[in-house]
Amino acid sequence: MISCGEASGDLYAGALVDALREIDPGVEVFGFGGERLRAAGADLIGDYRGFSVTGLSEALPVLSRSWKMLNALREAARTRRPDVFVAVDFPDFNFRLLPAMRALGVKVVYYVSPQLWAWRPARLETIRRYVDRMLVIFPFEKALYERAGVPVEFVGHPLVDLARAGQPRDAFLRANKLDPARPVLALLPGSRPSELRHVLPGLAAAAPLVAARVPGVQFLVARAPALDDGLFAPLDAVRAAGLPVAIVTGATDDVLASADAVVTASGTATVQAALHGAPMVIVYRLSAFTYAVGRRFVRVSSYGMVNLVAGRLIVPELIQDQFTPEAVAAEAASLLTDRARAEAMRRDLATVRATLGSPGASRRAARALGTGDFSTDRAMKEPEVGRANDRPTSGS
């Protein structure tokens, strides 16, 4: 049984199931996820879309549906009795399934750690109580769980395998009616509806300011699947100003590989951009209520994962009140015009890529599940995936 939420979790879960089927073609997989997990052959009891939100106030409208889905998954586990339950990130949902799995005697593996090092560290006790093994994708997470006495394995980041462009840059840009000879700024506003509502208006307002600083600039927008067209209405004003804008669905890697610089919402996309060596600016905004509450609990000095992995601020971050159209335009224009700065950032991003492990993360995770041995943190018979450096906070 497997449970994931959000586009990134669905991507990782689907790749994991593909790798499991290479080991055991007859493996039965069911649970909660999205189209990528379904494409891997999982029997989905529910689809995560509509459950994934950011923030406290944003979560209230989905609580009733979440409880119904949790009950359906608990009942499915009681009926079908899986050997292993794999939780993929999505802790606000998945943590509520852990006690039921323990009561049924189902082994629990958590693949892709919740960000305990950033906030809500009390969740570590829940993991220690209910989880048989953690499979982590960032090197500094291994040391955190080892200190807590939780069996853990660093398998590497699945995006090392998955972050691949499908088309040559020039062909991709021409297919989307953009000129390969002109500068391209990619905009990645997030994958959740709540993120787009908070982030995309600011990016749209910044676009004409970037154009005023960088003549000929074009805008390439990465759109996550299954998002409503109305969420992208802020871009209508950009088009009305005569600026070239292409919105591309389900091709984030091609967008990143084609861009000269990127403005991205904080999250998985920052790692994806790093793997493509794309100079970037990280932005984020929450509701005022959620941000005010969250500031009291956040324990890190950076929001962007690339900065946390690097242990220092290698990519600029514009968060909440700092996220203004003027600030975005200044940073983006600098990356598009200052070649020395952009190249220095690419070198820093290469050091981040080197810590994320060798190819084969999904295969290593699948083999960890396939052993059935959850008592020790055994060494995988795979190439080294990188040294687990202890960097829970930026600048530490």
Where are the model-predicted features located?
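Nucleotide-activated sugar donor-binding and catalytic core shared by glycosyltransferases
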Residues: M1-S396
